[in-house]
Design a protein with these regions (language model features):
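Membrane-embedded alpha-helical bundles of multi-pass integral membrane proteins
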Residues: 1-284
Length: 284
């Protein structure tokens, strides 16, 4: 299996970062509770409970507000649904820091669950790449972009940011189409670093899940007693990747186990960094 020193170091680091993340998240929850409890209760807010609850759930599941943007709707839906489904891979990740062939009880080798995991790992990865490209192409939400919709773009931009780029250097004419050439980025007013942080967290986590599935296939295929699980039935979308890993590692179980430890640690640390940040930045 994996190098004992490497496994112990990654395990200890994961536990330390996780403890700090939980404390940060608890602090964030307490802050939100204090803020909410400072308000005046509205006895009728929840009524009718069923109708309001269904409205929230149906709006989230159908993404009906994303009208006219089918690709963005599909990408965002895949990313959203991948969150709860891939949570269980985080649990697996902790265990794999110590036992690299670990799988979840009951679900670990349950083919429908494995298919679901891989579909949403790849789907979440593709979805977040689409959303990142859309955000990049939509502009950065700068004062210069916002000024494009003004009757005097250069004057408005200079008033908002004297050192900024004159809108006239970006594009003329300036259609009102929510693009960098038009009314400005649709993300105007959002905090860009927060968006980039969330996007990269999702990208890294989904990529780690895909890579780990391939590594699991590889280590199962070279481990006596587990090789029966190394098949397309259990790894429908990552068996090809696992075969590449087997060849690259020259069928060395130790090399594959070390790789599992490193990728699992990256996934855990990335997830806990996200938990820490949202505990500090409760307005994200």
């Amino acid at each position: 299996m994996a190098n004992p020193t490497l496994s112990a170091i990654m395990w200890g680091l994961a536990l330390l970062v996780s403890a700090l993340a939980v404390l940060s998240f608890a602090r964030g929850l307490a802050h939100m509770w204090r803020t909410v409890s400072a308000g005046t209760p509205d006895p009728g807010r929840l009524a009718p409970v069923g109708k309001r609850a269904w409205g929230v759930v149906s709006a989230a599941l159908t993404h009906r507000e994303c009208k006219g943007r089918p690709w963005i709707k599909a990408a965002h839906w895949l990313v959203m649904v991948s969150f709860p489904i891939l949570f269980f891979t985080l649990v697996t990740g902790y265990a794999q820091l110590r036992v690299q062939t670990f799988t979840l009880p009951l679900l670990g080798h349950f083919a429908p669950w494995e298919w679901l995991t891989e579909v949403f790992a790849w789907g979440g990865l593709a979805g977040i790449i689409v959303l990142m490209v859309v955000r990049q192409r939509a502009g950065h939400g700068t004062a210069t972009e916002a000024a494009l919709s003004n009757d005097d773009p250069d004057g408005a931009a200079a008033a908002a940011d004297p050192d900024g780029t004159p809108p006239s250097s970006l594009s003329r004419p300036h259609p009102r189409d929510s693009s960098p050439r038009g009314l400005a980025s649709r993300f105007l007013g959002s905090t860009r670093w927060q968006a980039l942080f969330v996007e990269w967290v999702i990208l890294i986590v989904c990529a780690c899940v895909v890579v780990l599935r391939g590594l699991e296939y590889a280590i199962f295929s070279v481990t006596p007693g587990l090789d029966a699980h190394a098949s397309a039935l259990h790894f429908p979308l990552t068996a090809w990747l696992g075969a590449l890993f087997v060849g690259a590692a020259s069928s060395s179980a130790t090399s594959l186990a070390n790789a599992i430890v490193l990728v699992s640690a990256l996934k855990v640390l990335t997830s806990m960094t996200w938990l820490t940040v949202i505990g500090i930045q409760t307005g994200m």
